[in-house]
Curated annotation (Swiss-Prot):
Family matches, as Pfam families: Ribosomal_S5, Ribosomal_S5_C
SUPFAM superfamilies reported in the protein's UniProt record: dsRNA-binding domain-like (SSF54768), Ribosomal protein S5 domain 2-like (SSF54211)
Protein name (record): Small ribosomal subunit protein uS5
Gene Ontology biological process terms from the UniProt entry: translation
GO MF term list: rRNA binding; structural constituent of ribosome
Subunit structure: Part of the 30S ribosomal subunit. Contacts proteins S4 and S8.
Keyword RNA-binding recorded: yes
PANTHER family hit by this protein: MITOCHONDRIAL RIBOSOMAL PROTEIN S5
Amino acid sequence: MSNIGRNVSGDLKEKLISVNRVSKTVKGGRIFSFSALTVVGDGHGKVGFGYGKAREVPSAIQKAMEKARRNMIQVPLNNGTLQYSVTGSYTGSYIFMKPASNGTGIIAGGAMRSVLEVAGVHNVLAKTYGSTNPINVVRATMLVLESMKSPEMIALKRNKLVKEILENSYL
């Protein structure tokens, strides 16, 4: 599993999480193709992931990056960390993420770490349970980040003041 990161124009950070070679057996032999999993983010709460497949590695990476740019979401951050503790799952991967104090860093493994880095999360404690398949872990992480709400959004939904929400919760 490789983790190649680079900055591109428009202040987007791109990270290649994994490249897999897959083969299809036909009458004449095997046909090899490649799949790439990438994440893209601006470092300020916007993040997206993409999965691309092609006959050659560069084409697969390019397709994955393009899909990642098209599927970006906004994550409500709180001073470089999460708003509150969250859990989530996708197929066999279960994840737990918890906000951390300043200076902690990103305590997360593998694919989840890449997603959090490009999203702009600087302090978080995270753990993956079950399957550590990079695709499932990235999807679970994205689902959890997408479901997070800021205190302002919660207050608006409940017709309350932000102050009331923050007083009565662990946000």
